[in-house]
Amino acid sequence: MGKLHRGLAEFNGCASSIPPKYQTVIISNEEKKGFSSQSRRFEEYLNESPGPGSYLSHSPAEGCSPSFSKRGTGSFASKGGRVPRSFQRLSPGPDAYNLQMSLLHKHDFNRGESRIFRLPYALKKEKPNNENPAPNQYDVSYRAVDKNSTISGESAFRSKTRRSAVVSDKFKGPSPCHYKVSDVLVQKSPQALVSCFKSKTARIQSPVRNNIPGPGTYNPHQPPEPVKRTVLPRRYYLGLSAPPLIPEKVPPFPGPGHYDIVNYNRPVKHMVSSAAFLSGTNRHMQEVKGQDIPGPGFYEPTVLSKTSFLYNPAKLWIPA
């Protein structure tokens, strides 16, 4: 049901999918003797009081929390690692460079404090073989090297399209404040019932200006004005050319009495009984205008005895 560990070393085991109920840690106070001394130098006892850093407000970015099952815990928990703990970095670490002595920490307990073990001061400083900056002089970005620590389920058909659009120099058009968009293209017109045979004729037509006199302009009892004409002399006269003729003015518009007005005041027709399929054709023949128009049979077309190219409206020059 539980786990057993020995020693003070921190145990970083794999988190099982079904965690155990408790964990047993055995601490031994054994330590190695140094310099023939039997006194204990380090006394560390594990207690339940919170240590330094326990009350930090922020939590680590990568949390390792076991999953608790609804049916409880069991002794056959899986020990397979869900998230890999170690990441392989392709970039050189801090120990790959040769640091200067001045950059090392002065308070090093591995060195003696006596003057016997110190190096002499009058020494020629060695020039570094590589003048590149040290690891503590710049910040290395591991975004392109490290793998993603939060491994989650990924779809096989994951989109590879970038979310941040790269604006190129080709799209250098005017901004929205440089032009005005017509509301007709944006807003929708109210939908109403419209007939498919809707008339497009304007109901109110524009007034037409004409010089035709209106009603009441003429006076039928007033005699017409005499026409002015040039009277040529009847005798001979000396002149190099004919006398000038004054051009006639534009004839006036027709007045009342110029047209044959039809009398529409005919006797009223009385309704008589008739058949259901009475013909609506008028029996009275109207006066046909243009009596001088020749009727059928007026012409006598002559038949040509010989073929002539002059009478060839179809322009067919090949004999049939």
UniProtKB/Swiss-Prot annotation:
Q: Out of the domains of life, which is the source?
A: Eukaryota
Instruction: Supply the alphabetized keyword list.
Output: Apoptosis, Cytoplasm, Nucleus, Repeat
STPGR repeats: from-to residues: 49-82, 91-103, 132-163, 173-192, 213-233, 254-266, 294-305
Any one annotated GO CC term: male pronucleus
- Molecular functions per Gene Ontology: chromatin binding; histone binding
Subcellular localization(s) per the UniProt record: Cytoplasm; Nucleus
Which residue stretches belong to region Disordered?
46-91, 207-226
Q: Where is the composition biased (Polar residues)?
A: 66-76
Q: Give GO terms for biological process.
A: apoptotic process; epigenetic programing of male pronucleus
What job does this protein perform?
May positively contribute to the induction of apoptosis triggered by O(6)-methylguanine.
Family designation: Belongs to the STPG1 family.
> Can you name this protein?
O(6)-methylguanine-induced apoptosis 2
The organism is: Danio rerio
